[in-house]
């Protein structure tokens, strides 16, 4: 699976998705397609890019190394700095290096609090659904 950030490079220009693109008719259609196919997690990948920019013939590119903005095209750097990619999902790795040490500590507090809440409801949620036969795997009916 492709990672955040992916782009297609054609004629030395990066084509990528941002919040503005997702608000267009084509962007809304892309989101609907991904939701309908239970693949919203693919939003940051080349498949979504190729669907949105179907006319492009350029080369697939991606980078997950956020240690320096120099690893990315300047257009993408500007989009990140201007908070224009907040609706594009991260892959498995959240780029905490975007935050300074104080921001990372705050992020970890938020994450731990959310994880604690999730752990409280995880098992009861499973059994609540399992109780209903329509949600059970056929092998467990």
What are these regions (language model features)?
Residues 1-141:
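Short, glycine-biased loop/turn motifs at secondary-structure junctions and
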């Amino acid at each position: 699976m492709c990672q955040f950030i992916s782009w297609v490079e054609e004629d030395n220009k990066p084509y990528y998705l941002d919040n503005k693109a997702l608000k267009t008719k084509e962007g809304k259609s892309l989101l609907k397609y991904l939701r309908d196919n239970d693949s919203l997690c693919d939003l940051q990948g080349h498949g979504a890019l190729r669907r949105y920019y179907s006319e492009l013939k350029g080369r697939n590119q991606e980078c997950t190394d956020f240690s320096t903005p120099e690893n990315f095209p300047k257009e993408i750097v500007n989009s990140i700095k201007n908070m224009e990619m907040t609706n594009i999902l991260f892959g498995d790795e959240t780029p905490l290096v975007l935050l300074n040490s104080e921001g990372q500590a705050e992020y970890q507090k938020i994450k731990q609090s959310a994880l604690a809440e999730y752990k409280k409801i995880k098992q009861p949620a499973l059994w609540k659904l399992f109780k209903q036969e329509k949600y059970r795997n056929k092998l467990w009916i």
